[in-house]
């Protein structure tokens, strides 16, 4: 897929419409390589990505269910189950986070957060260019 075609044709795909197979190890590696090429003032690389799949999705579902219980004690069991199932809608989740460095740098926190967003966008674009759907949630 040509670069401009990939950029202009990418759309978010709801987790409800994502299915297997998940990207292979080589496809993931290519996508993470694209993420590493993101604009990054100061070359701090503040982004961190956590890949969740397999049993990890079930454990994450339990975390979602517990969060729903704590947010709404006495919630209908269907609400709790719906929260649990959100983690199981796709074969792979990638959690993106910014680890903001505050000491020893003049780079403002907001620029580090923006760099993480850029890396995440590169990741989404790379998966799209390889034929996969994805959504930032």
Cite the ranges covered by each PLM segment.
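Small-aliphatic-rich amphipathic alpha-helix that forms the alpha element of a beta-alpha
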Residues: 35, 94, 100-137
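Short beta-strand element of the conserved SAM-dependent methyltransferase core
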Residues: 17, 96-97
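A short acidic, glycine/proline-enriched capping/turn motif at secondary-structure boundaries
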Residues: 56-58, 99-102
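N-terminal amphipathic, basic helical "cap/leader" segment at the start of enzyme domains
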Residues: 1-89
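A structural motif
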Residues: 89, 93-95
């Amino acid at each position: 897929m040509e670069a401009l075609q990939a950029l202009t044709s990418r759309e978010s795909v709801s987790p409800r419409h994502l299915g297997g197979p998940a990207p292979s190890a080589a496809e993931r590696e290519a996508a993470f390589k694209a993420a590493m090429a993101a604009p990054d003032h100061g070359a701090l690389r503040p982004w961190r990505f956590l890949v969740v799949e397999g049993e990890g999705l079930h454990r994450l579902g339990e975390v979602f269910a517990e969060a729903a219980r704590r947010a709404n004690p006495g919630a209908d069991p269907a609400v709790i189950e719906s929260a649990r199932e959100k983690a199981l809608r796709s074969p792979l989740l990638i959690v993106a986070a910014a680890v903001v460095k505050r000491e020893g740098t003049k780079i403002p926190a907001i620029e580090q957060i923006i760099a993480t967003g850029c890396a995440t966008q590169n990741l989404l674009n790379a998966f799209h260019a390889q034929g996969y759907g994805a959504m930032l949630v």
